[in-house]
Regions:
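Conserved SAM/SAH-binding beta-strand->alpha-helix loop
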Residues: 187-189
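Conserved Class I S-adenosyl-L-methionine-dependent methyltransferase catalytic core
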Residues: 1-12, 16-17, 41, 45-155
């Protein structure tokens, strides 16, 4: 149940609005996010009862209570660029739940359930912040021979197998300006998203993606 309410907070931008705009009443948060006050009030009260939010004055009336996102919760619930960010788990739970009827049918038929579609929730980017913050800055530099080769001439060409939406490829290209990276994945939707991500990162010239079986 908590993760389902986290899904709402992530999907509707409620956490980011509290983090960026500071404490708010239910009406203020609804105005910031283009949502309905009555529903937002229920979400705020539930989150306060569960300890995810704090209330300035619990004795205040329902419409006067101001809710805040504690500083220690911001990296986990509001900052998508932080390696501790976890709000995407609510999205993944909702997305996975849509496929459960097909899983139940597979129990009866012995077949395989179809792959989960991305719509309407989208694909949680579980590894995005970790790759962008750690792969090229800590993990690869911790392997001296690999780090040296990636920095040296002639420029290395790297194959990134099962690259998903491309964040590992992008992180390597950002950390090592000489290299080129070829990402491969079976998931054509992921490859399409990876191409967009590389374009937005300004790396389309050095990072390419192909939907292919690399086995």
């Amino acid at each position: 149940l908590e993760l389902l309410t986290v899904y709402l907070g992530e999907r509707l931008g409620l956490y980011q609005a509290l983090s960026a705009g500071g404490p708010a009443t239910s009406a203020e948060l609804a105005a910031r996010t283009g949502t309905v006050e009555r529903y937002v009030r229920e979400w705020l009260e539930h989150h306060a009862a569960s300890g995810l939010l704090e209330v300035d004055d619990p004795a205040a009336g329902p419409l006067d209570r101001r809710y805040r996102l504690p500083p220690g919760h911001v990296p986990v619930l509001a900052d998508t660029g932080d390696v501790r960010y976890q709000a995407f788990n609510g999205t993944e739970i909702v997305r996975a739940a849509r496929g459960m009827p097909q899983v139940a049918e597979a129990f009866r038929s012995g077949g395989a359930p179809p792959p989960l579609t991305w719509a309407p929730e989208g694909r949680p980017e579980f590894n995005r912040a970790v790759f962008l913050n750690l792969l090229g800055r800590q993990w690869l530099p911790a392997i001296p021979d690999v780090d040296l080769r990636l920095r040296a001439e002639p420029p290395a060409r790297v194959a990134d197998l099962a690259c998903g939406t491309g964040w590992s490829s992008i992180a390597m290209a950002q950390a090592y300006p000489l290299i080129s990276v070829d990402g491969f994945d079976l998931d054509s939707d992921a490859i399409e998203a990876a191409g967009r991500n590389a374009q937005e990162a300004g790396l389309a010239g050095r990072v390419t993606f192909t939907a292919a079986d690399a086995s």
